[in-house]
Amino acid sequence: MKVIDTDLLSIQQARILLEQAENSRKILLDIDKETRNELLKKIKQYYKTNIDQLAKMSFEETSYGKYEDEIKLGNYYLDNLDDELNSYPQIFDIVNGKNSKQVALSKGVSLVFIAPYLSTLTSFQAIYFAIRALNPLIVVSDLRCEKTVTKMVEDIKKILKENFYPRGFLDILTYNSDLGEKTLYESEKVSFILENLLSENKRKIQNDKAQIFKAEIGNNIVFIDKDCDIDKASCEVINSKTFNNGLLPGVEQSIVVEENAYEKVVEKFKEYGAFFLSKDEHIKLEKILYDQDHNCRKELIGRSARQIAEIAGIKVNSDTKILVVTKPYVSEKSPYSKEKYNPIVSLYIENDWLNACEKCVELILNDKKGQSLSIYSNDAYVIEQFIEKKPVARVLVNSPTGLGSVGIGTNLPISFSLSTKKIEGCNQTSLTPNHFMKFREIGICDKKDISSFLSEKTVKKDKDLFDKILNSLEKNY
Protein backbone atom coordinates (compact mmCIF):
# COMPACT_ATOMS: atom_id res chain seq x y z
CA MET A 1 0.00 0.00 0.00
CA LYS A 2 1.32 3.42 -0.97
CA VAL A 3 1.43 5.92 1.92
CA ILE A 4 1.38 9.64 1.07
CA ASP A 5 2.42 12.28 3.60
CA THR A 6 0.14 15.18 2.64
CA ASP A 7 1.82 17.60 5.06
CA LEU A 8 5.24 17.09 3.46
CA LEU A 9 3.80 17.38 -0.05
CA SER A 10 1.93 20.54 0.94
CA ILE A 11 5.01 22.16 2.51
CA GLN A 12 7.13 21.25 -0.51
CA GLN A 13 4.54 22.62 -2.94
CA ALA A 14 4.20 25.83 -0.90
CA ARG A 15 7.96 26.40 -1.05
CA ILE A 16 8.03 25.82 -4.81
CA LEU A 17 5.09 28.20 -5.35
CA LEU A 18 6.83 30.91 -3.32
CA GLU A 19 10.08 30.49 -5.23
CA GLN A 20 8.36 30.59 -8.61
CA ALA A 21 6.25 33.60 -7.63
CA GLU A 22 9.29 35.55 -6.50
CA ASN A 23 11.21 34.69 -9.68
CA SER A 24 8.28 35.70 -11.90
CA ARG A 25 8.15 39.15 -10.34
CA LYS A 26 11.54 40.09 -11.79
CA ILE A 27 10.22 39.45 -15.30
CA LEU A 28 6.78 40.97 -14.74
CA LEU A 29 8.03 44.50 -14.12
CA ASP A 30 9.16 44.73 -17.76
CA ILE A 31 5.58 44.28 -19.03
CA ASP A 32 4.08 47.54 -20.32
CA LYS A 33 0.59 48.89 -19.62
CA GLU A 34 -0.82 48.10 -23.07
CA THR A 35 0.18 44.43 -22.78
CA ARG A 36 -1.32 44.25 -19.28
CA ASN A 37 -4.58 45.80 -20.39
CA GLU A 38 -4.92 43.33 -23.29
CA LEU A 39 -4.48 40.45 -20.85
CA LEU A 40 -7.04 41.91 -18.45
CA LYS A 41 -9.59 42.09 -21.28
CA LYS A 42 -9.07 38.38 -21.99
CA ILE A 43 -9.47 37.42 -18.33
CA LYS A 44 -12.60 39.53 -18.04
CA GLN A 45 -14.01 37.86 -21.16
CA TYR A 46 -13.15 34.43 -19.73
CA TYR A 47 -15.15 35.12 -16.57
CA LYS A 48 -18.04 36.65 -18.52
CA THR A 49 -18.24 33.58 -20.77
CA ASN A 50 -17.96 31.04 -17.94
CA ILE A 51 -19.69 32.74 -15.00
CA ASP A 52 -22.88 30.65 -15.27
CA GLN A 53 -20.99 27.36 -15.37
CA LEU A 54 -18.61 28.35 -12.56
CA ALA A 55 -21.36 29.60 -10.23
CA LYS A 56 -23.39 26.41 -10.72
CA MET A 57 -20.28 24.28 -10.21
CA SER A 58 -19.53 26.12 -6.97
CA PHE A 59 -23.09 25.60 -5.72
CA GLU A 60 -22.93 21.88 -6.54
CA GLU A 61 -19.74 21.66 -4.45
CA THR A 62 -20.84 23.71 -1.46
CA SER A 63 -24.68 23.85 -1.49
CA TYR A 64 -24.18 27.39 -0.11
CA GLY A 65 -26.28 30.35 -1.22
CA LYS A 66 -28.02 30.73 -4.59
CA TYR A 67 -26.00 30.46 -7.78
CA GLU A 68 -28.52 32.71 -9.58
CA ASP A 69 -27.60 35.54 -7.20
CA GLU A 70 -23.86 35.02 -7.70
CA ILE A 71 -24.39 35.17 -11.47
CA LYS A 72 -26.49 38.34 -11.13
CA LEU A 73 -23.88 40.00 -8.91
CA GLY A 74 -21.03 38.88 -11.17
CA ASN A 75 -22.65 40.27 -14.32
CA TYR A 76 -23.35 43.56 -12.56
CA TYR A 77 -19.69 43.76 -11.56
CA LEU A 78 -18.45 42.97 -15.07
CA ASP A 79 -20.76 45.59 -16.59
CA ASN A 80 -19.39 48.25 -14.23
CA LEU A 81 -15.78 47.06 -13.90
CA ASP A 82 -14.11 49.43 -16.37
CA ASP A 83 -15.86 52.52 -14.99
CA GLU A 84 -15.17 51.33 -11.44
CA LEU A 85 -11.41 51.06 -12.04
CA ASN A 86 -10.99 54.33 -13.94
CA SER A 87 -10.40 56.23 -10.70
CA TYR A 88 -7.61 53.87 -9.57
CA PRO A 89 -4.03 54.18 -10.82
CA GLN A 90 -2.06 51.35 -12.37
CA ILE A 91 1.53 50.64 -11.44
CA PHE A 92 4.03 53.31 -12.48
CA ASP A 93 1.20 55.84 -12.79
CA ILE A 94 1.91 59.20 -11.18
CA VAL A 95 -0.60 60.22 -8.53
CA ASN A 96 -0.81 63.95 -7.89
CA GLY A 97 -1.32 64.95 -4.28
CA LYS A 98 -1.93 68.41 -2.88
CA ASN A 99 1.70 69.07 -2.02
CA SER A 100 3.58 66.17 -3.61
CA LYS A 101 3.54 63.41 -6.18
CA GLN A 102 3.45 59.66 -5.65
CA VAL A 103 4.24 56.76 -7.93
CA ALA A 104 2.19 53.54 -7.74
CA LEU A 105 4.33 50.41 -7.47
CA SER A 106 3.72 46.67 -7.39
CA LYS A 107 3.40 45.44 -3.81
CA GLY A 108 4.94 42.01 -4.38
CA VAL A 109 4.00 38.36 -3.93
CA SER A 110 0.39 38.12 -2.71
CA LEU A 111 -1.58 35.34 -1.04
CA VAL A 112 -5.37 34.99 -1.06
CA PHE A 113 -7.61 32.63 0.95
CA ILE A 114 -10.97 31.95 -0.72
CA ALA A 115 -14.13 31.25 1.33
CA PRO A 116 -16.87 28.84 0.15
CA TYR A 117 -19.39 31.62 -0.60
CA LEU A 118 -19.28 33.88 -3.68
CA SER A 119 -16.08 31.95 -4.40
CA THR A 120 -15.99 32.64 -8.15
CA LEU A 121 -16.50 36.37 -7.60
CA THR A 122 -13.91 36.76 -4.85
CA SER A 123 -11.42 34.66 -6.84
CA PHE A 124 -11.95 36.69 -10.01
CA GLN A 125 -11.64 40.03 -8.22
CA ALA A 126 -8.44 39.05 -6.39
CA ILE A 127 -6.84 37.59 -9.54
CA TYR A 128 -7.85 40.59 -11.65
CA PHE A 129 -6.47 43.11 -9.15
CA ALA A 130 -3.24 41.15 -8.71
CA ILE A 131 -2.60 40.91 -12.45
CA ARG A 132 -3.43 44.59 -12.89
CA ALA A 133 -0.75 45.44 -10.31
CA LEU A 134 1.69 42.77 -11.58
CA ASN A 135 1.62 41.01 -8.22
CA PRO A 136 2.37 37.28 -8.38
CA LEU A 137 -0.57 35.57 -6.67
CA ILE A 138 -0.88 32.28 -4.79
CA VAL A 139 -4.43 31.06 -4.12
CA VAL A 140 -5.55 28.88 -1.21
CA SER A 141 -9.12 27.64 -1.51
CA ASP A 142 -11.46 26.36 1.18
CA LEU A 143 -11.78 22.61 0.63
CA ARG A 144 -15.52 22.94 0.10
CA CYS A 145 -15.10 24.98 -3.12
CA GLU A 146 -11.67 23.67 -4.15
CA LYS A 147 -12.69 22.14 -7.51
CA THR A 148 -14.29 25.34 -8.75
CA VAL A 149 -11.50 27.65 -7.64
CA THR A 150 -8.83 25.28 -8.99
CA LYS A 151 -10.59 25.19 -12.37
CA MET A 152 -10.67 29.01 -12.48
CA VAL A 153 -6.98 29.30 -11.61
CA GLU A 154 -5.92 26.62 -14.09
CA ASP A 155 -8.01 28.18 -16.88
CA ILE A 156 -6.53 31.62 -16.27
CA LYS A 157 -3.03 30.12 -16.07
CA LYS A 158 -3.55 28.83 -19.62
CA ILE A 159 -4.44 32.35 -20.76
CA LEU A 160 -1.29 33.67 -19.07
CA LYS A 161 0.84 31.00 -20.75
CA GLU A 162 -0.65 31.78 -24.18
CA ASN A 163 0.34 35.41 -23.63
CA PHE A 164 3.90 34.51 -22.57
CA TYR A 165 3.56 35.48 -18.92
CA PRO A 166 6.14 33.84 -16.64
CA ARG A 167 5.50 30.62 -14.77
CA GLY A 168 4.57 31.24 -11.15
CA PHE A 169 2.70 34.51 -11.77
CA LEU A 170 -0.52 32.76 -10.71
CA ASP A 171 -0.90 29.41 -8.98
CA ILE A 172 -2.89 27.49 -6.38
CA LEU A 173 -1.97 25.27 -3.44
CA THR A 174 -3.45 21.91 -4.46
CA TYR A 175 -2.02 19.86 -1.58
CA ASN A 176 -3.93 21.57 1.21
CA SER A 177 -2.73 21.21 4.80
CA ASP A 178 -2.31 23.47 7.81
CA LEU A 179 1.49 23.20 7.56
CA GLY A 180 1.49 24.02 3.86
CA GLU A 181 -0.68 27.09 4.46
CA LYS A 182 1.54 28.15 7.36
CA THR A 183 4.60 27.90 5.09
CA LEU A 184 2.89 30.35 2.76
CA TYR A 185 1.51 32.91 5.17
CA GLU A 186 4.62 33.06 7.36
CA SER A 187 7.01 33.47 4.44
CA GLU A 188 9.09 36.65 4.19
CA LYS A 189 8.57 36.49 0.42
CA VAL A 190 4.88 37.41 0.85
CA SER A 191 3.99 41.12 0.89
CA PHE A 192 0.18 41.06 0.97
CA ILE A 193 -2.35 38.54 2.37
CA LEU A 194 -6.08 38.63 1.66
CA GLU A 195 -7.79 36.40 4.23
CA ASN A 196 -11.32 35.99 2.93
CA LEU A 197 -12.73 33.26 5.17
CA LEU A 198 -15.69 32.58 7.46
CA SER A 199 -14.91 33.80 10.98
CA GLU A 200 -14.54 30.35 12.55
CA ASN A 201 -12.07 29.38 9.81
CA LYS A 202 -9.71 32.33 10.28
CA ARG A 203 -6.00 31.48 10.45
CA LYS A 204 -3.75 32.81 13.20
CA ILE A 205 -1.50 34.62 10.77
CA GLN A 206 1.74 36.07 12.04
CA ASN A 207 3.87 37.86 9.44
CA ASP A 208 5.60 41.16 10.18
CA LYS A 209 6.64 41.51 6.54
CA ALA A 210 3.15 41.29 5.04
CA GLN A 211 0.07 43.50 5.14
CA ILE A 212 -3.01 41.47 6.05
CA PHE A 213 -6.53 42.31 4.86
CA LYS A 214 -8.97 40.35 7.05
CA ALA A 215 -12.25 40.10 5.16
CA GLU A 216 -15.44 38.82 6.78
CA ILE A 217 -19.22 38.95 6.58
CA GLY A 218 -19.45 40.98 9.80
CA ASN A 219 -21.99 41.49 12.58
CA ASN A 220 -23.87 44.28 10.80
CA ILE A 221 -26.74 46.30 12.17
CA VAL A 222 -29.69 48.27 10.80
CA PHE A 223 -31.46 50.96 12.83
CA ILE A 224 -34.98 51.86 11.70
CA ASP A 225 -36.08 55.28 12.97
CA LYS A 226 -39.77 56.05 13.55
CA ASP A 227 -39.70 58.92 11.03
CA CYS A 228 -38.16 57.01 8.10
CA ASP A 229 -39.87 55.45 5.09
CA ILE A 230 -40.64 52.15 6.85
CA ASP A 231 -42.01 50.49 3.73
CA LYS A 232 -38.77 51.20 1.82
CA ALA A 233 -36.60 50.14 4.77
CA SER A 234 -38.48 46.86 5.25
CA CYS A 235 -38.42 45.93 1.58
CA GLU A 236 -34.71 46.73 1.12
CA VAL A 237 -33.53 45.03 4.31
CA ILE A 238 -35.40 41.80 3.59
CA ASN A 239 -34.31 41.62 -0.05
CA SER A 240 -30.72 42.35 0.94
CA LYS A 241 -30.68 39.77 3.75
CA THR A 242 -32.18 37.06 1.55
CA PHE A 243 -29.74 37.72 -1.32
CA ASN A 244 -27.60 34.59 -1.75
CA ASN A 245 -29.40 33.19 1.33
CA GLY A 246 -27.63 35.60 3.67
CA LEU A 247 -24.08 34.99 2.41
CA LEU A 248 -22.98 38.48 1.44
CA PRO A 249 -20.24 40.67 2.96
CA GLY A 250 -21.81 43.35 5.15
CA VAL A 251 -25.17 41.56 5.25
CA GLU A 252 -27.74 42.49 7.90
CA GLN A 253 -27.53 40.51 11.16
CA SER A 254 -29.56 42.58 13.65
CA ILE A 255 -32.35 45.13 13.36
CA VAL A 256 -32.86 47.77 16.04
CA VAL A 257 -36.28 49.44 15.93
CA GLU A 258 -37.67 52.45 17.75
CA GLU A 259 -40.67 51.42 19.87
CA ASN A 260 -43.05 53.83 18.13
CA ALA A 261 -42.20 52.20 14.79
CA TYR A 262 -42.31 48.57 15.94
CA GLU A 263 -45.87 47.66 14.92
CA LYS A 264 -45.47 49.25 11.50
CA VAL A 265 -42.12 47.48 10.98
CA VAL A 266 -43.64 44.10 11.91
CA GLU A 267 -46.54 44.72 9.52
CA LYS A 268 -44.25 45.63 6.63
CA PHE A 269 -41.71 42.89 7.36
CA LYS A 270 -44.51 40.29 7.21
CA GLU A 271 -45.78 41.85 3.99
CA TYR A 272 -42.35 41.31 2.39
CA GLY A 273 -41.88 37.72 3.58
CA ALA A 274 -40.69 37.77 7.20
CA PHE A 275 -41.77 35.07 9.63
CA PHE A 276 -41.50 35.98 13.34
CA LEU A 277 -40.45 33.02 15.48
CA SER A 278 -41.89 32.41 18.93
CA LYS A 279 -39.50 31.89 21.85
CA ASP A 280 -39.98 28.11 21.71
CA GLU A 281 -39.39 28.11 17.96
CA HIS A 282 -36.16 30.07 18.06
CA ILE A 283 -34.82 27.86 20.87
CA LYS A 284 -35.71 24.82 18.76
CA LEU A 285 -34.02 26.38 15.72
CA GLU A 286 -30.87 27.21 17.69
CA LYS A 287 -30.42 23.57 18.74
CA ILE A 288 -30.64 22.41 15.12
CA LEU A 289 -28.65 25.21 13.48
CA TYR A 290 -25.70 25.65 15.86
CA ASP A 291 -23.19 23.35 17.53
CA GLN A 292 -22.11 23.53 21.18
CA ASP A 293 -19.58 26.27 20.35
CA HIS A 294 -22.36 28.37 18.79
CA ASN A 295 -20.94 27.95 15.28
CA CYS A 296 -23.38 27.33 12.45
CA ARG A 297 -23.29 23.71 11.33
CA LYS A 298 -21.44 23.71 8.00
CA GLU A 299 -24.07 21.65 6.21
CA LEU A 300 -26.74 24.26 7.09
CA ILE A 301 -24.84 27.40 5.99
CA GLY A 302 -26.44 29.37 3.17
CA ARG A 303 -29.79 27.54 3.20
CA SER A 304 -33.08 29.34 2.58
CA ALA A 305 -35.39 30.32 5.44
CA ARG A 306 -37.95 27.69 4.43
CA GLN A 307 -35.31 24.94 4.22
CA ILE A 308 -33.98 25.77 7.69
CA ALA A 309 -37.48 25.92 9.18
CA GLU A 310 -38.38 22.57 7.64
CA ILE A 311 -35.21 20.92 9.00
CA ALA A 312 -36.01 22.35 12.45
CA GLY A 313 -39.62 21.15 12.27
CA ILE A 314 -41.07 24.67 12.28
CA LYS A 315 -44.10 25.37 10.11
CA VAL A 316 -43.79 28.65 8.20
CA ASN A 317 -45.74 30.40 5.44
CA SER A 318 -45.12 29.39 1.83
CA ASP A 319 -43.85 32.89 0.98
CA THR A 320 -41.36 33.07 3.89
CA LYS A 321 -38.04 34.66 2.90
CA ILE A 322 -36.54 35.50 6.27
CA LEU A 323 -36.80 34.33 9.90
CA VAL A 324 -36.93 36.96 12.64
CA VAL A 325 -35.91 36.31 16.25
CA THR A 326 -37.08 39.01 18.67
CA LYS A 327 -34.55 39.44 21.49
CA PRO A 328 -34.81 41.59 24.65
CA TYR A 329 -31.06 41.91 25.17
CA VAL A 330 -27.63 41.20 23.65
CA SER A 331 -25.92 38.05 24.88
CA GLU A 332 -22.35 36.87 24.33
CA LYS A 333 -23.63 33.29 24.52
CA SER A 334 -26.44 33.68 22.01
CA PRO A 335 -25.55 32.98 18.36
CA TYR A 336 -28.43 35.25 17.39
CA SER A 337 -26.42 38.27 18.63
CA LYS A 338 -23.55 37.48 16.24
CA GLU A 339 -22.80 36.75 12.58
CA LYS A 340 -25.44 34.52 11.00
CA TYR A 341 -24.85 32.68 7.73
CA ASN A 342 -28.51 32.30 6.81
CA PRO A 343 -31.57 34.53 6.20
CA ILE A 344 -32.08 35.02 9.94
CA VAL A 345 -32.06 38.37 11.75
CA SER A 346 -32.42 39.38 15.38
CA LEU A 347 -34.81 42.20 16.25
CA TYR A 348 -34.34 44.55 19.21
CA ILE A 349 -36.86 47.16 20.36
CA GLU A 350 -35.77 50.39 22.08
CA ASN A 351 -37.70 53.32 23.56
CA ASP A 352 -36.05 56.00 21.45
CA TRP A 353 -33.12 56.63 19.12
CA LEU A 354 -30.72 57.34 22.00
CA ASN A 355 -31.31 53.90 23.53
CA ALA A 356 -31.19 52.41 20.04
CA CYS A 357 -27.83 54.08 19.60
CA GLU A 358 -26.52 52.35 22.73
CA LYS A 359 -27.97 49.01 21.62
CA CYS A 360 -26.12 49.30 18.31
CA VAL A 361 -22.83 49.93 20.12
CA GLU A 362 -23.51 46.94 22.39
CA LEU A 363 -24.08 44.70 19.37
CA ILE A 364 -20.95 46.00 17.63
CA LEU A 365 -18.78 45.36 20.67
CA ASN A 366 -20.35 41.97 21.40
CA ASP A 367 -18.04 40.06 19.05
CA LYS A 368 -15.93 42.96 17.71
CA LYS A 369 -17.06 42.33 14.13
CA GLY A 370 -19.14 45.49 13.67
CA GLN A 371 -18.24 46.07 10.06
CA SER A 372 -21.23 47.98 8.66
CA LEU A 373 -24.14 49.90 10.15
CA SER A 374 -27.16 51.29 8.35
CA ILE A 375 -29.55 53.96 9.56
CA TYR A 376 -32.94 54.54 7.99
CA SER A 377 -33.96 58.03 9.05
CA ASN A 378 -34.89 61.48 7.75
CA ASP A 379 -33.53 63.27 10.82
CA ALA A 380 -30.18 64.88 9.95
CA TYR A 381 -29.14 65.19 13.62
CA VAL A 382 -29.83 61.51 14.38
CA ILE A 383 -27.95 60.44 11.24
CA GLU A 384 -25.02 62.64 12.23
CA GLN A 385 -24.86 61.07 15.70
CA PHE A 386 -24.81 57.55 14.28
CA ILE A 387 -22.06 58.42 11.79
CA GLU A 388 -19.98 60.12 14.47
CA LYS A 389 -20.28 57.68 17.37
CA LYS A 390 -20.49 54.14 15.99
CA PRO A 391 -17.23 52.12 16.00
CA VAL A 392 -17.74 50.60 12.55
CA ALA A 393 -15.84 50.67 9.26
CA ARG A 394 -18.73 52.14 7.29
CA VAL A 395 -22.13 53.75 7.91
CA LEU A 396 -24.84 53.60 5.25
CA VAL A 397 -27.75 56.04 5.16
CA ASN A 398 -31.16 54.84 3.95
CA SER A 399 -29.54 51.80 2.35
CA PRO A 400 -29.31 48.14 3.39
CA THR A 401 -25.95 47.07 4.80
CA GLY A 402 -25.61 43.98 2.60
CA LEU A 403 -26.11 45.17 -0.96
CA GLY A 404 -25.10 48.71 -0.01
CA SER A 405 -21.76 47.69 1.51
CA VAL A 406 -20.68 45.79 -1.61
CA GLY A 407 -21.39 48.89 -3.70
CA ILE A 408 -24.87 48.22 -5.08
CA GLY A 409 -26.81 51.50 -5.16
CA THR A 410 -24.24 53.39 -3.08
CA ASN A 411 -21.06 55.38 -3.72
CA LEU A 412 -18.93 52.67 -2.09
CA PRO A 413 -16.56 50.57 -4.24
CA ILE A 414 -18.02 47.42 -5.78
CA SER A 415 -16.15 44.90 -3.67
CA PHE A 416 -16.77 41.40 -2.34
CA SER A 417 -14.12 41.44 0.39
CA LEU A 418 -14.87 43.81 3.28
CA SER A 419 -12.91 44.42 6.46
CA THR A 420 -13.40 46.22 9.74
CA LYS A 421 -9.90 47.74 9.63
CA LYS A 422 -7.78 49.72 7.20
CA ILE A 423 -4.29 48.60 6.33
CA GLU A 424 -1.31 50.91 6.13
CA GLY A 425 -1.20 52.99 2.97
CA CYS A 426 -4.86 52.47 2.02
CA ASN A 427 -7.80 54.42 3.40
CA GLN A 428 -10.58 52.03 2.31
CA THR A 429 -12.00 49.00 4.11
CA SER A 430 -13.48 47.57 0.90
CA LEU A 431 -10.95 45.64 -1.17
CA THR A 432 -9.78 47.81 -4.10
CA PRO A 433 -6.91 47.76 -6.63
CA ASN A 434 -4.94 50.04 -4.30
CA HIS A 435 -4.57 47.22 -1.77
CA PHE A 436 -2.35 45.42 -4.28
CA MET A 437 -0.08 48.44 -4.73
CA LYS A 438 2.23 50.55 -2.63
CA PHE A 439 2.69 54.28 -3.11
CA ARG A 440 6.05 55.95 -2.92
CA GLU A 441 6.24 59.69 -2.42
CA ILE A 442 8.56 61.61 -4.71
CA GLY A 443 10.01 64.99 -3.75
CA ILE A 444 12.11 67.47 -5.71
CA CYS A 445 13.98 70.57 -4.67
CA ASP A 446 12.15 73.28 -6.62
CA LYS A 447 11.02 75.83 -4.02
CA LYS A 448 12.39 79.33 -4.06
CA ASP A 449 12.59 79.64 -0.28
CA ILE A 450 15.74 77.49 -0.31
CA SER A 451 17.50 79.54 -2.97
CA SER A 452 20.06 80.53 -0.35
CA PHE A 453 21.26 76.91 -0.39
CA LEU A 454 20.97 76.21 -4.12
CA SER A 455 21.36 78.40 -7.17
CA GLU A 456 18.33 78.97 -9.37
CA LYS A 457 20.17 77.17 -12.16
CA THR A 458 20.60 74.01 -10.06
CA VAL A 459 16.97 74.07 -8.98
CA LYS A 460 15.79 74.31 -12.58
CA LYS A 461 18.15 71.55 -13.64
CA ASP A 462 16.84 69.26 -10.89
CA LYS A 463 13.26 70.10 -11.79
CA ASP A 464 13.86 69.32 -15.47
CA LEU A 465 15.35 65.97 -14.48
CA PHE A 466 12.38 65.24 -12.23
CA ASP A 467 9.88 66.03 -15.00
CA LYS A 468 11.85 63.85 -17.40
CA ILE A 469 11.67 60.90 -14.98
CA LEU A 470 7.91 61.32 -14.48
CA ASN A 471 7.29 61.58 -18.22
CA SER A 472 9.38 58.47 -18.82
CA LEU A 473 7.39 56.47 -16.26
CA GLU A 474 4.06 57.52 -17.75
CA LYS A 475 5.22 56.88 -21.31
CA ASN A 476 6.87 53.49 -20.86
CA TYR A 477 4.56 51.85 -18.39
Regions found by a protein language model. Give the residues of each.
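Structural signal for hydrophobic packing residues in well-ordered secondary-structure cores
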Residues: 22-25, 29-32, 44-51, 55-58, ...
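Conserved C-terminal structural/oligomerization subdomain of aldehyde/semialdehyde dehydrogenase
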Residues: 2-3, 16, 23-25, 29, ...
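N-terminal Rossmann-like NAD(P)+-binding subdomain of aldehyde/semialdehyde dehydrogenases
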Residues: 1-103, 129, 271, 475-476
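Solvent-exposed alpha-helices and their adjacent loops that cap or buttress functional pockets
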Residues: 101-106, 162-166, 184-188, 204-207, ...
